[in-house]
């Protein structure tokens, strides 16, 4: 077991990185992801760890934001945070040879693969560096644990959401993979690349509309207690774990089944030029069939369900942000509310098309103006964390989508000994979210949903749902 601090390959002097209004408002928690590799015999685990460190050091010189300390802004009365960087900045980096740990009872890489990688069943503090407690000095922007298992490697990444969104962390992952592969091939990584123009322009997300009222964003609320942590620290939001029994299930959409689903909906539209995207089609299918499986029409027949999905605004602004922008730029969510009776109507291509059209309209109507409205609300609030979401996710009827299917994490080659990841998963058990995971080489992707245990069984028996997606596994909690 080894724990160190991987510093920037080119140290920086003392500096402060100012966070944007969207960075300040976003959920304050550590997002977590795991990358699983099948290790071949061309490199030893010692070699792999050495070159992972080498590659990470160069990557952090390109993206120092994730090597920073996140801390309160001095004398701020609005609970603002900032990123502090300096010559000793780096990322806590822990290596655990799980083959030598009594606590590792989860088997070899082939064992995990046979069970379809049940990473959420592995206790957090075995797989990840334990989450630090907030202190006056702040918190690390990110920390990493490399787990060596028999036949494989599991990289567990935690990053503070205030630093960047999922696209931002994928930029770090892409660069880390590239520099590690070069280091493994040549014995040393390349020099740090110069960031693309606009990659660090967080200041552009401080300018919002004036005199915004909460009525303009009815699914949000102004509430100083909504996110307040009992400790009094505002470096992290209060945790609100689900206390009722639930299941997290994983399903797979192949490229052919995605095409079949989209084709079925296109026949209703009778216009192939307006064919729904994969995300629109899958969102409609899951929203309908999971609502039916949860029997929401029985428990709340006169109610409604809110659908939300996060959007990447990088290309939606004028001028657009580069794809390499580091920061949060995925709020507000696109939102649409429909009667539960409509959502739970018998599943046909026509009824699915109704939901897909609603999802499309919501995303098209969420524009840069929407983003500037939210920024204006944050700027005028007594504290940046007073702006909170007013969603009723699981066990309520609302459904949120986090779509990372267009992130190329499954296709990045990390070099000899590692290759490309065989599995990428979120470890977070966020309430009521549908995750769309990165596409594989064949164009398919996995999804992960949270619902009642009995609802999963109904989904497994749903012939229409399983026509398009294949059940992989499920884990029950709070049973």
Swiss-Prot record:
EC top class, as a word: transferase
Annotated active site: 161 (proton acceptor)
Pfam families in the cross-refs: Transferase
Cited InterPro entries: CAT-like_dom_sf
GO biological process: emericellamide A biosynthetic process; emericellamide biosynthetic process; ergot alkaloid biosynthetic process; fumigaclavine C biosynthetic process
EC code: 2.3.1.-
Keywords carried by this UniProt record: Acyltransferase, Alkaloid metabolism, Transferase
Pathway(s) this gene product operates in, as recorded in its UniProt entry: Antibiotic biosynthesis
Domain of life where this protein originates: Eukaryota
GO function term, MF aspect, one: acyltransferase activity
Consequence of gene disruption: Impairs the production of emerecellamide A, C, D, E and F.
Family, as annotated: Belongs to the plant acyltransferase family.
Protein purpose: Acyltransferase; part of the gene cluster that mediates the biosynthesis of emericellamides, secondary metabolites acting as antibiotics. The biosynthesis of emericellamides initiates from the highly reducing polyketide synthase easB which catalyzes the formation of the linear polyketide chain. EasB produces several polyketides that can be further processed by the downstream enzymes. The polyketides are released from easB as linear polyketide carboxylic acids, which are converted to CoA thioesters by the acyl-CoA ligase easD.
Quaternary state and interactors: Monomer.
Protein name: Acyltransferase easC
Organism field: Emericella nidulans (strain FGSC A4 / ATCC 38163 / CBS 112.46 / NRRL 194 / M139) (Aspergillus nidulans)
């Amino acid at each position: 077991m080894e724990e160190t601090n991987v510093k920037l390959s080119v140290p920086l002097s003392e500096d402060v990185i100012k966070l944007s209004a969207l960075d300040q408002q976003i959920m304050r928690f550590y997002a977590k992801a795991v990358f699983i590799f099948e290790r071949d015999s061309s490199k030893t685990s010692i070699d792999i760890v050495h070159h992972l460190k080498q590659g990470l050091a160069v990557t952090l010189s390109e993206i120092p934001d994730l090597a920073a300390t996140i801390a309160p802004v001095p004398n701020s009365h609005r609970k603002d945070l900032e990123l502090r960087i300096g010559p000793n900045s780096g990322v806590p980096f822990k290596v655990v040879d799980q083959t030598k740990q009594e606590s590792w009872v989860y088997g070899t890489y082939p064992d995990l693969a046979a069970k379809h990688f049940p990473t959420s069943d592995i206790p957090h503090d075995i797989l990840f560096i334990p989450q630090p407690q907030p202190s006056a000095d702040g918190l690390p922007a990110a920390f990493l644990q490399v787990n060596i298992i028999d036949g494989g490697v599991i990289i567990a990444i935690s990053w503070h959401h205030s630093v960047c969104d999922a696209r931002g962390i994928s930029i770090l992952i892409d660069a880390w993979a590239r520099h590690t592969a070069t280091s493994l091939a040549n014995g040393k990584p390349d020099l740090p690349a110069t960031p693309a123009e606009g990659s660090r322009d967080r200041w552009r997300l401080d300018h919002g509309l004036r005199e915004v009222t909460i009525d303009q964003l009815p699914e949000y609320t102004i509430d100083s207690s909504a996110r307040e942590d009992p400790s009094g620290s505002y470096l992290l939001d209060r945790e609100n774990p689900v206390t009722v029994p639930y299941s997290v299930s994983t399903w797979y959409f192949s490229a052919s089944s995605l095409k079949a689903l989209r084709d079925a909906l296109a026949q209703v539209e009778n216009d192939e030029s307006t064919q729904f995207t994969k995300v629109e089609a899958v969102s409609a299918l899951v929203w309908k069939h999971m609502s039916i499986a949860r029997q929401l029409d029985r428990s709340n027949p006169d109610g409604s369900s809110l659908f939300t999905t996060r959007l990447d605004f990088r290309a939606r602004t004028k001028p657009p942000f580069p794809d390499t922008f580091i920061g949060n730029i995925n709020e507000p969510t696109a939102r649409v509310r429909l009667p539960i009776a409509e959502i739970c109507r018998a599943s046909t291509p026509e009824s699915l098309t109704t939901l897909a059209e609603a999802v499309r309209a919501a995303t098209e109507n969420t524009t840069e103006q929407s983003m500037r409205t939210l920024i204006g609300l944050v700027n005028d609030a007594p504290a940046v964390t007073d702006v909170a979401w007013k969603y009723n996710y699981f066990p309520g009827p609302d459904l949120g989508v986090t779509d990372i299917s267009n992130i190329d994490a499954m296709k990045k080659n990390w070099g000899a000994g590692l290759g490309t990841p065989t599995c990428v998963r979120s470890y977070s058990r966020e309430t009521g979210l549908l995750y769309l995971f990165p596409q594989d080489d064949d164009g398919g992707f996995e999804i992960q949903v949270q619902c009642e245990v009995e609802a999963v069984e109904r989904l497994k028996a749903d012939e229409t749902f399983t026509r398009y997606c294949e059940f992989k596994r499920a884990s029950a909690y709070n049973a």
